A protein has these predicted regions:
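Short beta-strand/loop element within the Bergerat-fold HATPase_c
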Residues: 154-165
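Short conserved segment of the HATPase_c
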Residues: 178-190
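Conserved micro-motifs of the catalytic ATP-binding
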Residues: 85-91, 127-130
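Conserved catalytic submotifs in the C-terminal HATPase_c
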Residues: 92-95, 114-126, 162
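Short helix-loop "hinge" at the ATP-lid/N-box region of the Bergerat-fold HATPase_c
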Residues: 146-147
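Primarily the dimerization/phosphotransfer
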Residues: 12-51
């Protein structure tokens, strides 16, 4: 009897997983379809803004900013949906020198960091396996965000080895910090209604999903109170 119940339960679980996967695929196709329909309209608006530039530069500039924001939002929604639908497909790994890699990433971020802010890197010349492209993407996003909200003080990128197969990349700043009421939904998409020209709020959810596909996690260190600290922990 117990065995029969187990088999029946297992069948139900498999059916539920299959339905969930089908729903995800349908959602992805729906979003891609909507986005592809939006693209011609956005391209037309962008062209109109260029034509308007000579006659009314201020209005044209605003229009260009709004069109660019909508295009980015469309791209981000597509990527978010694609990531959600492929979480079990991990990225390919390759070897990097942590110290050299972190220095290069910080060099790319420096153009966004204010002159009153000191950038620093603390990472050893150690070989680790990871997906270089996706790791750089997450860290650059975090560093750029830190640059936006840090007027003075320091922005740092640090590497810590937590075990034979676990390591962390830590981005810390002395900026304004994140209000407590926003911290709970930080990695959840569509939890905040905001002006798209200031950002669509999908950057951290996308980074979190990329981290999951790297066999890791992206978290906010809520115990740090002198600014903001994000911890990207990876398992290899």
């Amino acid at each position: 009897v117990i065995l029969l119940k187990f088999i029946a339960g297992n069948r139900k679980l498999k059916k539920s997983v299959k339905i969930a996967n089908e729903h995800n695929e349908l959602k992805t196709k729906f979003i891609q379809n909507i986005s592809s329909q939006m693209e011609p309209t956005l391209n037309t608006l962008a062209h109109s803004a260029e034509e308007l530039l000579q006659k009314a530069p201020q209005e044209a500039g605003q229009m260009q900013g709004q069109v660019a924001a909508l295009k980015k939002f469309s791209d981000d929604i597509q990527e978010l949906s694609s990531l959600e639908n492929s979480l079990t497909e991990f990225y390919e790994l390759g070897e990097i020198n942590v110290g050299t890699f972190c220095e290069n990433v910080m060099d790319k971020a420096k153009e966004y960091i204010k002159t009153e802010v000191t950038p620093s890197v603390n990472a050893p010349k150690l070989q680790v396996k990871t997906n270089k492209e996706q790791l750089e993407r997450i860290l650059l996003y975090l560093l750029r965000n830190a640059a936006i909200y840090t007027e003075q003080g320091r922005i740092s990128l640090e590497f810590k080895k937590r075990g034979a197969h676990t390591h962390q990349f830590i981005v810390t700043d002395t900026g304004t910090g994140i209000p407590a009421e926003q911290q709970e939904n930080l990695f959840k998409p569509f939890t905040e209604v905001k002006d798209l020209t200031t950002g669509d709020g999908l950057g951290l959810p996308i980074c979190s999903l990329i981290a999951a596909k790297m066999n890791g996690s992206l978290t906010l260190d809520t115990g740090y109170t002198k600014g903001t600290r994000f911890i990207l922990e990876l398992h290899v």
